[in-house]
Structures are given as C-alpha cells and as structure tokens.
Amino acid sequence: MVTIALPKGRLTEEATELFQRSSLISIDISQETRKLVLEDPRGNLRFLMVKPFDVPTYVEYGIADMGIVGKDVLLEVNKKVYELLDLKIGKCFIALAGPKGLREELLKKPEKIIATKFPNITKEYFENVLGEDVQIIKLNGSVELAPILGLSDMIVDIVESGRTLRENGLEVYEKLYDISARLIINRASLKLKREIEGIVNCLERMILQ
C-alpha cells in the first residue's frame, strides 16, 4: 500500500479530482471532511489528511510515501524530500502587498515592517533580491489586517484572485513567486515501492493532456 499525505483546505478538491481523472481512486476524498485517514476500497492507496505545512514532514520521515503540497510550503520549509512533479493545480502567487496608492512611499521607507505567514520566504526575498534588512512579524492568518491596523507597513501573502486584497483597500506591489501544487516523494519509498512509479506515470500523463 502507498500512503499519500494530502493538505486539508483549498487543494483537497483539486487533488481529489486529479486522482479520480487518473483512475487511481474511486472515492471522493474531498467529501470525507472529518476523517483523517482514508483508504480507497481497492486497497492500494491510503490518504492522510494533514495541515499543508505538515505534508513535507510526514513525507520526510516516511510516514507518507508521497505528498501533494503547494510550492509556497516547500519554499518556506527546508525538508529532505524529492520534488518530482508540478501538478499544475492550486495555481496562485506569493506577493508583496500593501495599502492602495502607497507603493512608492512604502518601498522607499528605510525601516520596513512586513507581516506574513512566510517569514523565511520574506527574509530571503528582501535580503537576497532587494538587499534590505526588514523587520518581519509572523502571523498565522488574516494577514491583510496587519497594515490596516498599523501592525505592519506591508504584507507577503498568497494571492489567488486578489479580491481579498481589493476588499480591504490593499494592492499587489510585487509578485515574488508563482505557486502551484507539487508532488513530493520520500526518497527511500521511491526506491523500495514499485507501485509509486505507476502512480507517478498516471499523474504525469494526466498533466500532459
């Protein structure tokens, strides 16, 4: 049996659809909202429903053989996993954003405060790309509130449609990285479990269609 870690949340439905279209599963994982461990009736695949940032950890330690996770998570955490495929789902981007109309003023500000769920990505971008040292405040949600309430000057966050930013008087200043879901694999599992190659081939064919 191959164990696959899936992220709970926005990627679950798209990942389920991808597995179904690849004829790998017969169950609808996205409808099993309360179960944390799911097995396909055919008995060859087991799914672990975990938080997105925990997916690489389960794969790294071999609890899961494979996982689906956003590139944002892989950029933020340094885990020893093999990134095998860009699954072309869950597309969005990481952006530097702030109050509408203040872009030039805030980018020129000498001592910037940035709120984000991605402190490592933010630090790497400002230090290595812009050559700046900034104060970073780590938040776990509702990052858009930070500049509105004066906690930060700007934010670094995931943007899909940009609607949440617009509704809160914010706008994108810079696009940092394009993001999509990736298939990651435990290195030992890749060598030991022959079934993995078949799963990967099925997913790869579906992506290329």
UniProtKB/Swiss-Prot annotation:
Amino-acid biosynthesis: is it a keyword of this entry? Answer: yes
Name the catalysed reactions.
1-(5-phospho-beta-D-ribosyl)-ATP + diphosphate = 5-phospho-alpha-D-ribose 1-diphosphate + ATP
Q: Which GO terms fall under biological process for this protein? A: L-histidine biosynthetic process
Keywords, alphabetical: Amino-acid biosynthesis, ATP-binding, Cytoplasm, Glycosyltransferase, Histidine biosynthesis, Nucleotide-binding, Transferase
Q: Look up the record and name the pathway of this protein.
A: Amino-acid biosynthesis; L-histidine biosynthesis; L-histidine from 5-phospho-alpha-D-ribose 1-diphosphate: step 1/9
Q: Which domain of life is it from?
A: Bacteria
Q: Where in the cell is it found?
A: Cytoplasm
CDD domains cross-referenced by the UniProt entry: PBP2_HisGs
Q: Record's Gene Ontology CC terms?
A: cytoplasm
Documented EC number(s) = 2.4.2.17
Entry function: Catalyzes the condensation of ATP and 5-phosphoribose 1-diphosphate to form N'-(5'-phosphoribosyl)-ATP (PR-ATP). Has a crucial role in the pathway because the rate of histidine biosynthesis seems to be controlled primarily by regulation of HisG enzymatic activity.
Similarity-based family: Belongs to the ATP phosphoribosyltransferase family. Short subfamily.
Q: How does it assemble?
A: Heteromultimer composed of HisG and HisZ subunits.
- Read off the domain note: Lacks the C-terminal regulatory region which is replaced by HisZ.
Write down what this protein is called.
ATP phosphoribosyltransferase
